[in-house]
Amino acid sequence: MKKVVAGFFTLVLYCAQMEAQEQVTDSMAIQQLDEVVVSDSRFALKRENSGKTIIKITAAEIVQNQGRSIAELINSKSGIEINGSRSVAGQNLSYFVRGGNNRQVLVLIDGIQVNDPSQIANDFDLRLLDLNTIENIEIIKGAASTLYGNAAATAVISITTKNASKEKVALSLSSILGTNASQDDDNKTISNFNNGLNINGTLEKFSYVIGFANQYTDGLSAASGVNTEEDTFSRINTNIKLGYRFSEAFNLKVFGSFDKIKNDIDGFPAPLFQFADTNDKSVSEQLRFAIAPSFKYQNGSISMNASITNIDRETISDFPSVFESKGYNVDIFNKYVFGEQLYSIIGFNYQKNETLFAEEVTYTNNDPYANMVYVSEFGLNLNAGARLNKHSEYGSQLTYNFNPSYTFGLGSGYGKFLGSYSTSFIAPSLFQLFDGTFGNPDLEAEENRTLESGFEWNLGKKLRFSGLYFNRNEMNTVLFTTIDPANFISQYTNAEGEAKIQGVEFEIASELFLGLNFTANYTFTELNEGNRVRLPKHRANANLNYKISDRTNTAITYQYVGSREDTDFSTFQNVALDAYSLIDFYFGHQFKNNKLKLFINITNIFNEDYQEIIGYSTRGRNYNLGLNVSL
């Protein structure tokens, strides 16, 4: 494999050298002054008028991270730790945002909420998605329950899939081959295969996107240690995205997708019930259909996002399980702009989740909501709103947000001070309430309160710097509690006291000189009261990207994860995990006809030995070679 990498790298370097005289006319500008953000208001507003420090992952950044998973890419952003993203491909993922957990993170795909009612945390599994099908991602941190409802307590991850080309027919192909080895494995054989096909186009008023992707990965065992078997992971993605513009005022979009993952897992076999290298398996299938009509009128629009999701999951182990779940979501909302300063949205969100345990269980949400954004001529901006959560099990709960900011001129850019106070409501999942082994129907709903204060200086390409302090309180946090370790009896319970989390986040982005861009972020998270595992107090990421020519660029990324604690389930005691640092490398070249691109990335260059989860493997130095073809 090393010889293949060396030959590939030499070829691409030669092509890049032939074009080195080209002027870099389109440098990778990190942030533009006219950058538009949507997720925090549902309106396309300039970044300077937003009261949040929103994370945007562009199409260009996604291209530079080919060979990685969507979880790995999101994991490089401030305030976010996606635990399990550096382990075996099929490892379950934990979303830690500002000290929270999976149940407090909401995922949107093309503006439509997605979740799995059968999951413990009612969350969406990012392993189901292929990064090559994604156009861009926006992430807002902090409670956003007013606009997005139950579960949007620490973050909303808004994912937009690839859009149709203006051409009648456009075809793109991608293929990636790579290794998948631990730090102790010197046999760097090709064991990671990732392929994608996308056909799209526009025929007058009709647009279409049809995509297919598959991944097959082996070479690494979930359980760490010697003489362990390889645990394979495979994924199939198919998606279709259709649009029709009936008139200038009315358009309709229809979405459909089928995603399936199969992976070998290691578990806790009888009679000792301690983690070991086993032959367990897991299969998960998701079928999703959505429709999104929109009608525009003078100064406003009426839209609907409606979806049906069917998910089947099966685990084959000493603790076998089969889950069948369905999710229904309808969000109808009216947007209206008063002049050019006041943006309003009024909506109603219906959600129904159902899962089959010993019998079918279900709950519903019926939530009216309203939100307004005021953008003044003198720099004051205000985002405020409220939602009445009407839950079939927990009655009515009012959540609200208040988010002022002040923007002023700063040289050729702007400065901004911001603050926010927001609340959120999180009902226990169907699993936590009704599972026959661990469920507890007497659980109370969780309530969150989030306070933020920060600033942002933005000078366009040259510099963007932001800092933010956050303070979160969790009441009635749902915990998995071991009641009787000797007999392996556990149940979900509510925490007796409040969990209090605070921290700071810093981000910087700068074009050091033409073609050379630098980004970095640092997060400090402190848990004052409560209990969290696998949550580092200190995290940092950095990226140095150099665009050698219009068609060639290279990047080096760095990630630091501080020490943290994890639970050793053989002793039910918490133990400390050491801090670690990872460095990755990327090099890509687009050929002159713009039809072919070759790239290479090397992850964990220095083969750092570390643990994400006690007893589980992590990836060592690995290589990925890939190509993109556009026709």
Positions of PLM-derived features:
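Extracytoplasmic beta-strand/coil segments of soluble accessory domains associated
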Residues: 71, 75-113
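Outer-membrane beta-barrel translocator/receptor signature
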Residues: 133-135, 149-158, 164-223, 232-238
